[in-house]
Amino acid sequence: MGDTGRHKWFSFHHHRSASATTMPQHNSPGETPTEFLCPITGFLMSDPVVVASGQTFERISVQVCRNLSFAPKLHDGTQPDLSTVIPNLAMKSTILSWCDRNKMEHPRPPDYAYVEGVVRTRMDSLPPGSGHRIAKSEILPPVAENSNSNSDYDSVMGAIRSRSRTSLSSTTSLPLHQTRPINHSTRIQSSFSTSDYSSFPPMSPEEEEIYNKLTSVDTIDHEQGLIQLRKTTRSNETTRISLCTDRILSLLRSLIVSRYNIVQTNAAASIVNLSLEKPNKLKIVRSGFVPLLIDVLKSGSTEAQEHVIGALFSLAVEEENKMVIGVLGAVEPLLHALRSSESERARQDAALALYHLSLIPNNRSRLVKAGAVPMMLSMIRSGESASRILLLLCNLAACSEGKGAMLDGNAVSILVGKLRESGGAESDAAARENCVGALLTLSVGNMRFRGLASEAGAEEILTEIVESESGSGRLKEKASKILQTLRGGGSEFGEGAEAREWNRMLEASGLSRSQFQQGGQKGGFAYSSQF
């Protein structure tokens, strides 16, 4: 956008008078990387946060916009979703390092009144349509229309708790890092200063004991403190809540990225245990753990990666965390773990984490763009984690990008083949139902499906399912709906939205339905997978 690109959005704010104490320090646009500047103030960010739509802003800027019920239109024409805010610790660290290298002062938070003045001026000066006033309900974190019932939630968390209780290998079997020093020269540095802690509630004896070990100068104390935290939170729900404090979380943020395998592994396992309780899930994510968990997933030890995948699964169960975890980049490393992890449990947890993330539309698109569909279809062919993969494919088939990728990837033939392989085996009942569910989702409002299903011989196997004495009523109901689609629902070309779409295509081609019926079988225009 030339020289007007970065500051065009708020170019007027330089004319507002402000004292040095209220106006944040300004850095030359030619020297400061664009991504370090808040899109609203145009200044170096002191406390960067990621919003739900993926952009990074100064925290106070987001707070002002939310308080004024205003969603700014950015210079690229987009309007950010301010419903969720998560600290961008990686960006903050990068900015501070950049300042140190360039011998610049660290950025200070802008004055609230100054930012409010900037935003209000923007609201008053923009032409109609350039900004967007929104209702409070649009700014507050969204609530899913079809949220999981308590029984569903309890079922999922019961599985995670069971996994946590059985996952702890003997702590003495964990290898110590060969180069581990006996002592550190400094104590563990958390993101809080001692003065910050003075305003916190007093510690319980249990928390104080763990806290003292985690802040010790001795690495062995760190290990012992983490092992104690891990064991204490493994099965006691009350303790999991009481020990999920800002103090402990701050120390865990430092320890989870430790270069010592045993420290990193026990820190990750402790996060899994703490995340089991619903009140802790939002707290952990809002404390900035997701980027750290992703880093460990990409480059940590094998056992630490396994625990991190379990933590992401547990955190993704919470509705308000799904968007944030997706925005911060968990999808691709989870897909890699699903495909390549040596641990069966890690692969299963990765599939479940991705399933819960895919319950919201934005994450479905991320999965499709990351190449999830061909990868998962390949796994279905080889029989890997079939039931859970099929659940994921059901979700992806619900979005247009996913449905298109599945049809292009020969999903109908693969799914029908999977049904034939499973037969009526009780052991494959879940996979069969998920397989039929995926086919049903693909069939909805899609003209290509009928031809592809016919080529794959779907009608025969689906008829067997409906007429079989075994199988659940839900399975038979889904199969019946697909058969109705294949048989035209009382009309050769179907009814409703599909028929209307078909007629529009025929009219656009200059053909009538009768012309198509007469000539379509002679090679000119076949309703098949080539369509």
UniProtKB/Swiss-Prot annotation:
Tell me the SUPFAM superfamilies matching this sequence. ARM repeat, RING/U-box
Q: Which PROSITE patterns match?
A: ARM_REPEAT (PS50176), U_BOX (PS51698)
The record's annotation in InterPro entries points to: ARM-like, ARM-type_fold, Armadillo, Ubox_domain, Znf_RING/FYVE/PHD
Instruction: List each copy of the U-box domain by range.
Output: 31-105
Q: Tell whether Heme is among the UniProt keywords.
A: no
What are the record keywords, sorted?
Repeat, Transferase, Ubl conjugation pathway
Q: Where are the ARM repeats?
A: 237-276, 278-317, 319-359, 361-401, 403-444, 447-488
Please write the reaction equations for the catalytic activity of this protein.
S-ubiquitinyl-[E2 ubiquitin-conjugating enzyme]-L-cysteine + [acceptor protein]-L-lysine = [E2 ubiquitin-conjugating enzyme]-L-cysteine + N(6)-ubiquitinyl-[acceptor protein]-L-lysine
Keyword Glycosyltransferase included in the entry's annotation: no
Q: Organism source for this protein?
A: Arabidopsis thaliana
Main EC class the enzyme belongs to: transferase
Q: Where is the composition biased (Low complexity)?
A: 190-201
Which EC number applies?
2.3.2.27
Give the Polar residues compositional bias ranges.
180-189
Q: Where is this region: Disordered?
A: 167-205
Q: In which pathway does it act?
A: Protein modification; protein ubiquitination
Protein name, please? U-box domain-containing protein 39
Which Gene Ontology BP annotations are present? protein ubiquitination
Single GO molecular function: ubiquitin-protein transferase activity
Q: Which gene encodes it?
A: PUB39
State the protein's purpose: Functions as an E3 ubiquitin ligase.
